[in-house]
């Protein structure tokens, strides 16, 4: 398996059913470690700054929950589901900064 890339979506089963997860860790880290950092995708809608709606060109319909951050072993990554658009990834970057209390321009 090639190293997963930031912005890619995989299905993972962490013991409560297979769910989609978006890789948010940087590509250099992804190449050199046995795990990745990811956030959950969900169909539940929340109108708070840490949730991002997927766009029409994204691989799934739903929302990214930037509050739900997990470290996933690469061996836990299941089916590849696609990659989010750069526009959606920019919104996710802002949501992650908000969730983690990081300064964002």
UniProtKB/Swiss-Prot annotation:
SUPFAM superfamilies: Cell growth inhibitor/plasmid maintenance toxic component (SSF50118). Keywords: Endonuclease, Hydrolase, Nuclease, Toxin-antitoxin system. Gene3D superfamilies: 2.30.30.110. The keyword Nuclease applies. It comes from Mycobacterium tuberculosis (strain ATCC 25618 / H37Rv). Forms a complex with cognate antitoxin MazE4. Interacts with DNA topoisomerase I. RNA cleavage is inhibited by the C-terminal domain of DNA topoisomerase I. This is Endoribonuclease MazF4. InterPro entries: PemK-like, Plasmid_toxin/cell-grow_inhib. Toxic component of a type II toxin-antitoxin (TA) system. Acts as an endoribonuclease (mRNA interferase) on single-strand mRNA, cleaving between the first and second bases in the sequence UCGCU. Overexpression in M.smegmatis but not E.coli inhibits growth, this effect is neutralized by coexpression with cognate toxin MazE4. One of its GO terms (biological process) is mRNA catabolic process. It holds the Pfam family PemK_toxin. Its EC number is 3.1.-.-. It comes from the Bacteria. Belongs to the PemK/MazF family. The keyword Cell membrane does not apply. GO terms for molecular function: DNA binding; enzyme inhibitor activity; RNA endonuclease activity.
């Amino acid at each position: 398996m090639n190293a997963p890339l930031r912005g890619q979506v995989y299905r993972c089963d962490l013991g409560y059913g297979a769910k989609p997860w978006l890789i948010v860790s940087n590509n250099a880290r992804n190449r050199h470690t046995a795990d990745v950092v990811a956030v959950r995708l969900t169909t539940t809608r929340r109108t708070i700054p840490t949730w991002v709606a997927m766009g029409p060109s994204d691989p799934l319909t739903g929302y990214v929950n930037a509050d739900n951050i997990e470290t996933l072993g690469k061996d836990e990554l299941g089916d590849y589901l696609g990659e989010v658009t750069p526009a959606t990834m920019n919104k996710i970057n802002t949501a992650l900064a908000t969730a983690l209390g990081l300064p964002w321009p």
